[in-house]
Amino acid sequence: MLFYLGTYTQRGGAGVLGCELGAENAMRVIGSVFLKDPTYVIANARRDRLFCVCEAPAEGEEGGSAASFSLGENGAPVLLSRQNAVGRGPCHLCLSPDERFLYLANYVSGSVS
């Protein structure tokens, strides 16, 4: 079984991790992408794209950010893009039903972007 985690890098985490749960429930990291403080992570329905919010801003911006990833053959995340959240403190995200839009809830600014 594959699953994905966002980890606080300022506390020693590696960023976004792709993991596999194997025999005897042993967890194995299959890939990682360093982004500063990624938190909430979701995949699309086909599980070929992954999205996360980061408490840290994209370069040269204020507030948080969102990132998108493709998932390689083994499920490892590969960074596609990172954008400003247009809000502060992004904490949750969801895809529109047709998966054309990504919505972010911003805790600090109290906004949706």
Task: Enumerate the language-model features and the residues they cover.
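Short glycine/acidic-enriched loop and turn motifs that connect beta-strands
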Residues: 9-12, 56-60, 108-111
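Loop/turn position at the start of each blade in beta-propeller repeats
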Residues: 36-38, 88
